[in-house]
UniProtKB/Swiss-Prot annotation:
GO terms for biological process: cell division; proteolysis involved in protein catabolic process. ATP binds at residues 118-125. One of its GO terms (molecular function) is protein dimerization activity. This is ATP-dependent Clp protease ATP-binding subunit ClpX.
Length: 433
């Protein structure tokens, strides 16, 4: 009896759980660790390895080829865009290094980037991946929320505040960051004709962005919002901040076609797939005058000299996005299911049906997760309550909602340990560290 009591008192030295509360307790010299804490330690170490992978180039500037190779691991297709971005980013950070280490009469000017491409073609994701690779602060802004100073809406300086916050208020680090301004096409000038009503969310915003795009010492309100005369400001130099502006620029292909003299597609012609395939080739022939005609002001166009065009994603590209990148959606869901001890499989025609749905909705890669969530909802609801589920197969019928996913039951399957509450995990993370 005494031995039984002594055995029962064995506890994990990290989380304090007794031997009866865990599946396995591993003994060391004077200490014990349970299987749950081992699993948590493994997660923390793997997270550190991921950070090291991103920080691989901290001590040196990667070459354009290395940048593209890194992008290839996460972004499917868009080779032309990735090549231009790789060279542009390399030259930008080379310019910063050159400026900081050598004094010369030749001043290298900053070259910001303008990305054009259909919705869901990967504009935002490309910018995010670049920032992760280079380990620099990154912020996303929505151009549609911006207005001229003095009007209801956000001042352009609030974009800089987000970057400062993401750099943990390290101004020197923020000054080498990347800002992605989305929906930039939505601030195009509304009309070529002068108007008595001021265009505060269109041309006015373009004018307001000019200084920070070119490089200036900006005064940023630390709490955001509008500037007040008696408040203190954060001073930040935007000279070395790389601005990437992105937008769908719907309709600009017609302006390009008109300029190059090509015939536009017939009014009633139902050949959208051909048009989608062609749009990337048309966009590659873009010239500054096309942007001017679209409604961007000359001064703004001059401050984003590097133009990157992205292709519309076809069915094959969407299937690759689902399965091939390091963080592909299929891999993410398979990992989620594996945490519950369940194997997840997608049939080939199911993946094709998911891609077809994304094309039908005209959402590109951005809409893939929403489609996946719709398909997986019922299964993900049931799995945690049924320890006998061993495998789930997603079929084309399940994607089209004609049938449910195939669920394979194993009566002999051992019960899966359920994850603990977030608070408990955080406490244990603190103990481990």
């Amino acid at each position: 009896m005494a031995k039984f009591e002594e055995k029962k008192q064995l506890r994990c030295s990290f989380c304090g759980k007794s031997q009866d509360e865990v599946r396995r307790l591993v003994a060391g010299p004077g200490v014990y660790i349970c299987d749950e804490c081992i699993e948590l330690c493994s997660e923390i170490i793997s997270e550190d390895f991921e950070e090291e992978e991103y920080n691989e180039f901290d001590d040196r500037l990667p070459t354009p080829k290395e940048i593209k190779e890194f992008l290839d691991q996460y972004v499917v297709g868009q080779d032309h865009a990735k090549k231009i971005l790789s060279v542009a980013v390399y030259n930008h950070y080379k310019r910063i290094y050159y400026h900081n280490t050598k004094k010369d009469d030749v001043e290298l000017q900053k070259s910001n980037i303008l990305m054009l491409g259909p919705t869901g073609s990967g504009k935002t994701y490309l910018a995010q991946t670049l920032a992760k690779m280079l380990n620099v602060p990154f912020a996303i802004a929505d151009a549609t929320t911006l207005t001229e100073a003095g009007y209801v809406g956000e001042d352009v300086e609030n974009i800089l505040l987000r970057l400062i916050q993401n750099a943990d208020y390290d101004i020197e680090r923020a000054e080498r960051g990347i800002i992605y301004i989305d929906e930039i096409d939505k601030i195009a000038r509304k009309s070529d004709n002068p108007s008595i009503t001021r265009d505060v969310s269109g041309e006015g915003v373009q004018q307001a962005l000019l200084k920070i795009l070119e490089g200036t010492i900006a005064s940023v309100p630390p709490q955001g919002g509008r500037k007040h005369p008696h408040q203190e400001f954060i001073q930040i130099d935007t000279t070395n901040i790389l601005f990437i502006c992105g937008g769908a620029f719907e309709g600009i292909e017609k302006i390009i076609e008109k300029r190059i003299g090509e015939k536009t597609l017939g009014f009633n012609a139902k050949i959208e797939s051909k048009k989608e395939k062609k749009i990337g080739d048309i966009l590659r022939q873009i010239m500054p005058q096309d942007l001017l005609k679209f409604g961007m002001i000359p001064e703004f166009i001059g401050r984003v000299p590097i133009i990157v065009t992205l292709d519309a994603l076809d069915k094959e590209a969407l299937i690759k996005i689902l399965t091939e990148p390091k963080n592909a959606l299929v891999k993410q869901y398979q990992k989620l299911f594996a945490m519950d001890g369940v194997e997840l499989e997608f049939e080939k025609d199911a993946l094709e049906a998911i891609a077809d749905k994304a094309i039908e909705r005209n959402t590109g890669a951005r809409g893939l997760r929403a489609i996946m969530e719709e398909i997986m909802l019922d299964v993900m609801f049931e799995i945690p309550s049924n320890d006998k589920i061993e495998k789930v197969i997603i079929t084309k019928a399940a994607v089209l909602k004609e049938d449910k996913p195939i669920v394979i039951i194993n009566e002999n399957k051992k019960a899966q340990k359920r994850p603990k509450l977030k608070q408990r995990l955080q406490e244990r993370r603190g103990n481990v560290s």
